[in-house]
Regions:
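Amphipathic alpha-helical interface elements
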Residues: 1-69, 80-91, 95-108, 137-163
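Conserved active-site-adjacent core of cysteine acyl-enzyme catalytic domains
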Residues: 72
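Individual transmembrane alpha-helices with interfacial aromatic-anchor signatures
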Residues: 125-137
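Short secondary-structure subsegments characteristic of cysteine-rich extracellular domains
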Residues: 110-125
């Protein structure tokens, strides 16, 4: 595989991860709303017509809960077999959102680093250091797909494949 093909595959896989994370959060919010009849009605009637500058009711769809809070609330409301392991999902999301991805010179793969806040001695601890290999992408895509399948089951949505 050429360097260009490897880079293009990296970009495609990164897009899959980001898209899956967004879908997972949105799906979890939809499950929470679905279980609250009042909120479900508001979401179905208000949000399709909402415009910038409008105000809407506060609910799981419109609140500012972060991914961790949203998934914890989802787990409290969803059936046991639909619950998600929150920690690896949030860890991945935080690494992609707040980490540093780079590659230079002879490096075969891009590298993802996430740093903590500086310590009293002025140094910065490394929280995460991963080579973004094909296996790393595949493991994370599989993990998110399993979580998405659980959310889909909790929503009782039909899975459709693109043709």
């Amino acid at each position: 595989m050429s360097e260009r093909e490897l880079f293009e595959l990296h970009v495609l896989n990164l897009g899959k991860l980001v898209g899956d994370l967004q879908s997972l959060e949105m799906g979890a919010r939809m499950v929470i709303v679905k279980l609250d009849q009042r909120a479900a009605k508001q979401v179905q009637t208000q949000l399709p017509q909402v415009k910038a500058g409008d105000s809407v009711e506060l609910n799981a769809f419109t609140n500012d809960d972060d991914l961790d809070q949203t998934l914890e609330k989802y787990n409290k409301r969803s059936p046991l077999d639909c619950r998600i392991d929150v920690v690896p999902v949030v860890r991945l999301r935080d690494a992609l959102a707040h980490g540093r991805t780079f590659g230079f010179g002879p490096m075969k793969y891009l590298r993802l680093l996430k740093f903590s806040r500086k310590t009293k001695d002025g140094r910065v601890p490394v929280e995460l250091a991963e080579d973004m290999t094909a296996e790393w992408f595949n493991e994370n895509i599989r993990m998110l797909n399993k979580a998405l399948e659980k959310v889909r089951k909790a929503l009782d949505y039909e899975k459709r494949d693109f043709v």
